[in-house]
Curated annotation (Swiss-Prot):
One of its GO terms (cellular component) is cell division site. It comes from Pseudomonas fluorescens (strain ATCC BAA-477 / NRRL B-23932 / Pf-5). The keyword Signal does not apply. The gene is zipA. This is Cell division protein ZipA. Keywords: Cell cycle, Cell division, Cell inner membrane, Cell membrane, Membrane, Transmembrane, Transmembrane helix.
């Protein structure tokens, strides 16, 4: 059977129509893809706060709690665990700490030998009358004393007014035994962290005559057992001694009157760690 012109036109028409339909279908699919792509981009361009509000929900307000940190100005006195009293596990410490009672001070400025201390570490006074009945003789003497001396490079020594101003800025306050003590608070409240004595016998300061006072050296000392957090208290003591030496032209010395180095300071810290380890072992 021969295919005439009419049949060829019909076949060509069908092919053209099919091509048009296929092209239209392809364009429709391509248009859907583009529409979806534009929708996604429009969502990505939304402001951050609106997107966060829809996806994450409203922000919650959380209570914040700052952990106390110890620096060279104040030590925390409330949130830290209290050191276990020696007389009984049920006795409480009072808000204000008493200065440590120290025995004879041998703080003569003899460069051949370091100062010797006989320190006593008292528990803080408590409000209960039964705790008040304990006497000082029940308190053991300090097993170790960490000493940092500051020797003036000037022949005239540390002048009283300048020395007083410097140590007051470091938080030391004049107290028992006529020497200076650093408490937990700059205001002089809380337990005693460390003390500072005159390196010349009898080791005291006369505030009434401070304008005419001078000394060739002073000694900072921290007894163990002593403050509840001895490592932190020691860091505060080092900061106070450094401030004094830098501002008043002094030189730092250790308990052997050798130059205080970073290695010596680290050795002091290791002594504190070792003491705490022994104390913990004895409690078990």
């Amino acid at each position: 059977m021969e295919i005439g012109l009419r049949e060829w036109l019909i076949v060509i028409g069908i092919i053209v129509i099919a091509g048009i339909l296929f092209d239209g279908w392809r364009r429709m699919r391509g248009g859907k893809g583009k529409l979806k792509f534009r929708l996604d981009r429009s969502l990505s361009n939304l402001p951050d706060d609106e997107g966060s509000a829809e996806l994450l929900g409203p922000p919650r307000v959380l209570d914040t709690h700052k952990e106390p940190q110890l620096d060279e100005h104040d030590l925390p006195s409330v949130s830290m665990p209290a050191r276990e009293p020696r007389e009984s596990s049920s006795s409480k410490r009072g808000k204000r700490g008493g200065e440590p009672h120290q025995g004879d001070l041998n703080l003569d400025l003899d460069l051949d030998s370091g100062p010797s201390f006989s320190s006593r570490d008292d528990d803080f006074p408590v409000e209960e009358s039964k705790s008040a009945s304990h006497s000082d003789k029940d308190q053991p003497q300090a097993e170790e004393v960490l000493v940092i001396s500051v020797i003036c490079r000037d022949a005239a020594g540390f002048k009283g007014p300048a020395l007083l101003q410097n140590i007051l800025e470091s938080g030391l306050r004049f107290g028992e035994m006529d020497i200076f003590h650093r408490h937990e608070s700059m205001a002089g409240n809380g337990e005693v962290l460390f003390s500072m004595a005159n390196a010349v016998k009898p080791g005291v300061f006369d505030l009434d005559d401070i304008d005419h006072f001078s000394t060739p050296a002073v000694s900072f000392f921290l007894g163990l057992p002593g403050p509840r957090h001895p490592k932190q208290a020691f860091d505060v003591m080092v900061a106070a001694a450094r401030k004094l030496s830098q501002e008043l032209n002094g030189e730092l010395k250790d308990d052997q009157r050798s130059v205080l180095t970073a290695q010596t300071i680290e050795h002091y810290r290791q002594r504190i760690v070792e003491f705490e380890r022994r104390a913990l072992t004895q409690k078990r």
